[in-house]
Amino acid sequence: MTTPPIRQDLFGLSTVPFLTPPLKPFLDEDRQTCLDALSAFTHYRGFAALSGRPGCGKTALVHYFTQSLHPPSHKIMYLACGDFSGHDLLRAICCQLELEPVRSSSKTLAAIEQRLKDLGALTPILVLDEMQNASNASLELLRLLAASRFDSTRRLCMIMIGTDSFLGKLALAINESLRQRITYFHRLSPLDEAATATYLTHCLNQAGAHHQLIPPEAVKLIHDLSGGALRLINTLALAALAAASREQVPAVTLEHLHQVRTHVLLPKTQFTL
């Protein structure tokens, strides 16, 4: 029998932490504020833009939010935006609404509007992720979708998620009309050192830990190396636990982090193109 990379019995864990988001979300003041605002925003069916540096947990936070909604009263649609043409984006939205797209963008828009109207009291929530990749043509079609008043009633709730470069796109004059229709902006911040410690403890407790597995000096190094980005915090903590497990040590040390940092982070070297 092969030994698992992380021995749960060694650390007193019921599951392996940091592989997936914990069942109970980590909510510091910034993230709780965002969740509360999204709840109010969804009630009035508007457009929201959530931004932040890569790895700060934007998508996970919106996922927690949508999972908290009641399926009978909400229809959740999720799209990760690549370098779509405008019509490709409309086709993807049609698929989410179980519509057959047509060649004409104007007719496709009209069909989407009618389908949204037919949903009646059901609140459609369209989550558009990776919006920093969206073309100006795609943003223009979203503007057209937002511009329709559907008989003076807002029928679509849209949450757009992207890195800070997405805000740069919205700031362009060509996208001013769409920008003005966004009723809620929020930039998710990376964690400070204290929040990093709280986050690590939260994830470990959710995995069944009842004692300190990552001491303060290791927490500080994890924060310094990750810059407070949750994705990197997870990567470093998971790798450090695996290193401790290999040595059959029941807690992470600074040495474990120094062992793994060169393998899980981009090496600082001079690149030539």
Task: Please report, for each region that a protein language model flagged, where it lies by residue.
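A short, basic N-terminal segment
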Residues: 1-44, 262, 266-273
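Conserved AAA+ ATPase "SRH/arginine-finger" region at the nucleotide-binding site
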Residues: 79-82, 170, 183-196
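Short regulatory helix/loop adjacent to the ATP-binding pocket of P-loop NTPases
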Residues: 66, 166-181
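Walker A/P-loop nucleotide-binding motif
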Residues: 44-64
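C-terminal alpha-helical "lid" subdomain
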Residues: 2-6, 12-13, 177, 205-273
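Conserved NTP-binding/hydrolysis module of P-loop NTPases
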Residues: 14-18, 74, 84-103
